[in-house]
């Protein structure tokens, strides 16, 4: 997609990973991405655009106006999504309202997440995870935080090649934060 449309559109990706560059770079290198990837350790993107899960797609026109926002299950390899984006690029169409899928973020959960991130950055992983689990108790639909906990506790399910979505679904059914 990028090779075909890089003259018409700028593409960046944003990886939300609390563990940072060391966990993100192997994927970037494996995919041989030709566009920049920003690393969001603090989930600023989730707060800014109102999402609790990934992957997402947000298209911003040359005037800085968001004209497309798909929250969850964004995959450029999906034929329907690819067609929408091609139409947006070639015809400058507004595809979806910015407010169409904005999710209510819970301030107490965000504050607990940020406090946990402070402990994580101080290498107190155990206390960080405790705060993040409290955040999930308040906001059980926040899959970004939930999956980061899982990735820290079970790195082999996330960082050794293919992400194990079956394991994640089983874990989700068993968990009761």
Where do the model's predicted regions map?
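Short, internal strand/loop/helix patches
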Residues: 25-62
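Conserved helix-turn-beta segment immediately C-terminal to the redox Cys motif
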Residues: 1-15, 26-30
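Thiol-/selenol-based redox modules, centered on thioredoxin-like
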Residues: 61-130, 143, 153, 157-158
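Alpha-helical linker/edge segments of TPR/alpha-solenoid repeat scaffolds
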Residues: 94-95, 151-177
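Conserved structural position within tetratricopeptide repeats
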Residues: 29, 136-137
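Alpha-solenoid helical repeat scaffolds
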Residues: 113, 146-149, 164
């Amino acid at each position: 997609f990028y090779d075909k449309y890089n003259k018409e559109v700028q593409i960046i990706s944003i990886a939300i990973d609390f563990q940072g560059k060391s966990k993100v770079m192997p994927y970037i290198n494996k995919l041989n991405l030709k566009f920049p990837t920003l690393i969001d350790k603090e989930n600023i993107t989730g707060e800014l655009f109102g999402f609790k899960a990934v992957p997402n797609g947000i298209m911003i026109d040359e005037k800085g106006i968001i004209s497309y926002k798909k929250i969850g299950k964004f995959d450029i390899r999906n034929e329907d999504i690819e067609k929408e984006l091609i139409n947006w690029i070639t015809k400058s169409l507004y595809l979806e309202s910015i407010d169409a899928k904005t999710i209510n973020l819970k301030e107490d959960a965000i504050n607990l997440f940020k406090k946990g991130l402070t402990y994580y950055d101080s290498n107190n992983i155990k206390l960080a995870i405790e705060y993040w689990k409290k955040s999930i108790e308040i906001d059980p639909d926040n899959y970004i935080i939930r999956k980061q906990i899982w990735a820290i506790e079970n790195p082999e399910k996330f960082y050794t090649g293919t992400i194990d979505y079956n394991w994640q679904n089983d874990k989700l059914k068993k968990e009761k934060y």
